[in-house]
């Protein structure tokens, strides 16, 4: 049996944060070089505002600073941005969004609307199917 531990590289996207307004939470740019698979995992804690919605956007590009960023086409997503988006009712939940496009760089953004209270959230990227295994531990 092949293990998962030596074949993934987790990356921080959005550090755990308490969001109390409608400021977009723009994630770290993820570089896929050396990996053929990418999955974003979004985690929520307590979402206090009873009117809040949180919309997920995934962008891609070839420039390392994503100056050429464009929204990822639906055909290059595993799952949908709508399924990864959430409302105030999603306390303590986990959502996922996969990428199967061919661009080197991607970035996840979570944009709140109607949010005026503490909303706890975080996101990580899991790079998989490495060209070279085992992957570094601890992750680079």
Task: Report the location of each language-model feature.
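Solvent-exposed, flexible loop/coil segments flanking beta-strands in beta-rich domains
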Residues: 1-34
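C-terminal interaction-tip segments
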Residues: 1-12, 112-140
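Beta-sandwich interaction modules
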Residues: 25, 76-116, 123
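Short amphipathic, basic-aromatic surface patches that mediate peripheral association
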Residues: 28, 36-48
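Extended extracellular/luminal ectodomain segments enriched in beta-structured repeat modules
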Residues: 32-39, 103-105
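Residue-level signal for short segments within beta-strands and strand-turn junctions
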Residues: 44, 58-62, 112
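Extended, low-complexity, turn-rich repeat/linker tracts enriched in Gly/Pro/Ser/Thr and Asp/Glu
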Residues: 45-53, 114-118
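Non-cytosolic beta-sandwich-type ligand-binding/adhesion modules
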Residues: 49-91
